Amino acid sequence: MAAWACSPASFAAQAEPGKGLVLAPRQDFVAPPAGSYQLPIIQPAANGWVLDGNWLPRRLSSYTHGALTMLSFVYTYCTDPMGCPLAYETFATLRRLVLADPLLHGRVRLVSLSFDPAHDTPQEMVHYGGSNARSKVLPWAFLTTYSVNFLKPILDGFGQDVEVELDDKGKPTRTRTHLLKVFLIDAQAQVREIYSAAFLQPEVMMTDLRTLALERAGLPRKS
């Protein structure tokens, strides 16, 4: 995996999908048919206290149980096109694909959780989400935490590294360096796949979602 440094800047112009952002470069890999393979359990999804868009405290487990979940960590002022904006645009593409898929419609949620609770208040996260944060058709939760003390156990539980860069005087800046990861979580809150930036391909992710949906429905696996 590669590390992507995200520089502080306004994300407002990029917060809505379809505004010039690009998805990850296409890979030659072609996913096998949905249901023809298994996704083993990697680890339990981490839990902890988060804040929703109304400043209400919620357990993260309420966003990782009961549905197939795609979760990523972001921060709203990241502008590196292969960092947080890539995660956002990929989720926006997934949302459109899921809504058009009868097997997945009503069975999938998206979660974007902030790396920077000091800046990314619930209001900032709602603004970052735009119309996607308000949609009732397919849940896309834009969450933050009270503080780094609440965030760190969640990051540690997922194995998501992040570093705050220092300036020439050794003082913290607002630039965060992290490995872009997206976590696929099943309805029992078990992580079943972790995607890096290089493999953030909506078509592959859709096939994995369909595989877990078939598994949950108890339908025969394809040979």
Model-derived features: where do they sit?
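Sec/Tat-exported extracytoplasmic proteins
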Residues: 43, 67, 74-77, 82, ...
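Short active-site neighborhood of thiol/selenol oxidoreductases, capturing the structured segment around
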Residues: 59-90, 110
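Thiol-/selenol-based redox modules, centered on thioredoxin-like
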Residues: 156-223
